[in-house]
Amino acid sequence: MTTPLSIRARQLHERLQAGELIQLVDVREDQELAMARLDCPVIHLPLSRAAEWMDRVEALLDRDQPVAVLCHAGVRSWQFGCWLIEQQGFTAVLNLQGGIDAWSVEVDPAVPRY
């Protein structure tokens, strides 16, 4: 696999609710996180500040557990997911299709859309 697998918001939510250990990574910017966030633990790694965390990614993420990546619409998260696979050797990487916007529509309308 050289690109992340797409996962719909409802599917990801169901897997999390079932207790599956999936690491959630949000690559959006601070101001986006302030506008809308998931109501569960998320590792915040904004792409614009990659230089601050890139050399620590192995300490921040467990490569033995699946990683689901999200952004606003699914593009930046897909790029980060490709990097995890191609450059860091992660094998179980999911990209939240439609990003947090899809989560707002499919799972939790209390999460603001922007």
Segments predicted by a language model, with ranges:
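Rhodanese-like catalytic fold shared by cysteine-dependent sulfurtransferases
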Residues: M1-I22, D30-P66, V75-Y114
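Short, surface-exposed ligand- or partner-binding patches at beta-edge/loop junctions that are enriched
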Residues: L70
